[in-house]
Amino acid sequence: MNKWLEILKNNDYMGVKKYLKDGANLEETNDIGESVLACALRARCDMDLLMLLIESGADIFDFDEEGVSILDMAITYDNVDMVNYLIENGMDVNQTNRRSGFTSLMAAACYGRAKIVKILLENNVDQTAKDLKGFSAVDFARKMNKKSVLALLDYDENDPKNTSYAR
């Protein structure tokens, strides 16, 4: 995996192309089970390189040992183009593989990714989904004081339960 990480860190399209031609294994994972594609998202590789990986067989439906999906990684690293690509190619915006029940909308809310929240809402994401502790995306947005996200979600700042959160 070290060779992959080195190439991805440099966003080296030609290096990836050559490594793949030389027989590189796209199914390699890092210490925490992240795929090459997930590592490319973490390295903030451009869309051309990400598409090269996908067209070469990288699994867009992959997730790591904690259940963090490629969609989650795209949200974390604010890759709007990849979020759109994943949804257009069958990614279920309501599916989570995390044991905690943490969803893509919750991730977008935590990180204040308003543009991604809009995309998820346009694709019928469930705003009412709760994680194992009973928290929803609105709860995460309130906790993190993400006002731009709260403005997009079903949030009533005048509701008494919301008085100690963002206004």
Regions found by a protein language model. Give the residues of each.
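Ankyrin-repeat-protein effector appendages
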Residues: 1-6, 123, 132-135, 139-167
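Alpha-helical adaptor scaffolds
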Residues: 41-42, 64-90, 94-99
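Ankyrin repeat A-helix N-terminal signature
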Residues: 6-12, 39-46, 73-79, 107-113, ...
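Ankyrin-repeat and related helical/solenoid repeat scaffolds used for protein-protein interactions
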Residues: 94-139
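Ankyrin-repeat boundary/"N-cap" motif
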Residues: 1-4, 29-37, 63-69, 96-103, ...
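Ankyrin repeat domain, specifically the short helix-to-loop turn at the C-terminus of the second helix
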Residues: 18-25, 51-59, 84-92, 118-126, ...
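Intrinsically disordered, low-complexity regulatory segments in ankyrin-centric signaling systems
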Residues: 1-38, 42, 51, 55, ...
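Conserved ankyrin/ankyrin-like repeat signature
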Residues: 15, 48-49, 81-82, 115-116, ...
